[in-house]
Amino acid sequence: MVAAIRVPRSQRAKRELLKHAPKLVETGKKTLILHGTKTSAVLNSVLADLFHLKRDNAVKYSKKNDNIRPFESGGETSLEFFSLKTDCSLIVYGSHSKKRPNNLVLGRTYDHHIYDLVEVGVENYKSIESYVYDKKLAPKLGSKPFFAFIGEHFESVEELKHLKEVLLDLFKGEVVENLNLAGVDRVFVCTAISPTTVYMMHCALRLKRSGTSIPRIELVEVGPSMDLVVRRHRYPVESLKKEAMKTADHAKKMKNVTKDPVHGKLGKVYIPDQQIAKMSLSNDVKGLKRERREAKKNKDHSKKQKINPE
């Protein structure tokens, strides 16, 4: 499937295309959540909880897709089409079969083409609804989570290093310069149990008094939690990776230009002192023409007085 290139015919359509255009500072990545040909009740709950955690920046399709085979040649075409259609650069695809039960594929795209993929199996899953806790501790919409990766396998095993990168990209959100302490209210704890298994749990942060300026932090499980068993991987091609890692040059700072919240953009213009005495005046100046006409009129009037004396 190839989406047709459309030329905007209105200002509204033009603004929508500009939102999707490359930017010097990119906005947060959107996530596309898809169902395969067959999904289990566990997998449906996993996809629903992931959408709940990323509902401010995610698109979820509930319709089953028969022609998506992410790891087969040509099977990723539909994924790339949906990525382009929804402007999503992160993909979560769930499927269930006898060979690969409760299968979850996490993927990233570059320029709406598959960049890399990691396939995991979901085991020992506990949904958000199965946890009982004070609802005041529920993570707020738009909050940024901490990540804690426990275990040496995240540094020594290539598959887990790849999974770590994808998980960080999946929940990173928008890039910000400063963080409000009240906005950091949750943490994902990922523990490498073995070279192929990662236990992942989602916890809320409860701040308590400690007698100092730094509060004491307690972890309260709010769900979901699951074991992720690593299966297949698709690493990025080296040439594509090099292209994706390129960074744009920042625009040069304009001299003598400032921004004001009231007046907007302000600039200083330096003009040299004008030497009026040295300015050359042309003969085509309207004021001079008027003076010539008046002088000629006075001259003719004086001649008439001499010819016809009273």
From Swiss-Prot:
GO cellular component, one term: nucleolus
Record-annotated Brix domain positions: 29-239
InterPro entries linked to this entry: Brix, Rpf2
Region Disordered, residue ranges: 281-310
MF GO annotations: rRNA binding
Biological processes, Gene Ontology terms: maturation of LSU-rRNA from tricistronic rRNA transcript (SSU-rRNA, 5.8S rRNA, LSU-rRNA); ribosomal large subunit assembly
Residue ranges with Basic residues bias: 295-310
Keywords from the UniProt entry: Nucleus
Localization in the cell: Nucleus, Nucleolus
Family: Belongs to the RPF2 family.
Protein name: Ribosome production factor 2 homolog
Species this protein is from: Oryza sativa subsp. japonica
Lineage of the species this protein comes from: Eukaryota, Viridiplantae, Streptophyta, Embryophyta, Tracheophyta
